[in-house]
Amino acid sequence: MEIINYLIIALSVLFGASLTFFSGFGLGTILLPVFSLYFPIDIAIAATAIVHFSNNIFKFGMVYKHVHWPTLIRFGLPAMGAALLGALLLNFMGKQAVIYSYVLFHKELSITSLKLVIGALMLFFALFELLPKLSNWKMEQKYVPLGGVLSGFFGGISGHQGAFRSVFLTKTGLSKEEFIGTSNAIALVIDITRITVYATTIFKIIDFNGIKTSLLIGIAFAFLGTYFGKQLLTKTTIKGIQRVVGALLLVIGGLFCAGIL
């Protein structure tokens, strides 16, 4: 690989990790397409999981004191169980029928009914973060487990658990520090599960050309992005975090509807 390729990886990770510190998602969404430019998709997925997991451990060391344990238990545990069900349902559904396909930058992209539904849901939930009247709505504590189930299920079936987790967590009344700490703790547990699933592939990728340097750069710049995010924590508010979450949901939802993700 050339130096410019490593630079693209570094800048992508730096940007993604900085955003993820506040939003609770985004690093994997940005990094996977970048890695897939240079490596086979199975290698790219495993490499993304390694960087994501390493960064979540680093981030947890910074924010563990702010984890809101009651929410972690009442929201996180149902979310994890529902995420597994969603992932199993996705596997059961098999290959989706293509509604429309087109070519963009020499790559064939397909729009399926599932992608449209997931994208539409993300766009809908984005309104709850961006519109003033809806952004002030708070979830009653008795509905927190239900929020965990819904976020986990939609996350499991879409492969983007962080996005749905964040939009529900912002409605639980947590402070910005508690939101970041609790979201990270849930993500870390999910990452541990994911790493075990990818273990076989991870052992295979070590000798793949360019992967060691790419991983080292990815992990180092993820740490740097997370550090930058931590420095900006005092300058942001929970409203600011909601806007970041909403903006990312709009982008990712649009990409789903367009068949790019």
Question: Each predicted region: which residue ranges?
Answer:
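Transmembrane helix exit motif
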Residues: 56-62, 87-98, 112-140, 231, ...
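Structural signature of hydrophobic alpha-helical transmembrane segments
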Residues: 5, 35-53, 109-120, 149-159, ...
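Selective hydrophobic functional segments
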Residues: 46-105, 192-238
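Cytoplasmic-side transmembrane-helix entry/capping segments in multi-pass membrane proteins
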Residues: 69-79, 139-148, 181-184, 241-246
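Hydrophobic alpha-helical transmembrane segments in multi-pass integral membrane proteins
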Residues: 44, 84-94, 155-160, 194-197, ...
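Residues within membrane-spanning alpha-helices of integral membrane proteins
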Residues: 6, 49, 119-122, 126, ...
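Selected transmembrane alpha-helices and immediately adjacent juxtamembrane segments
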Residues: 1-39, 128-183
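Residue-level signature of the transmembrane alpha-helical core
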Residues: 10, 14, 18, 49, ...
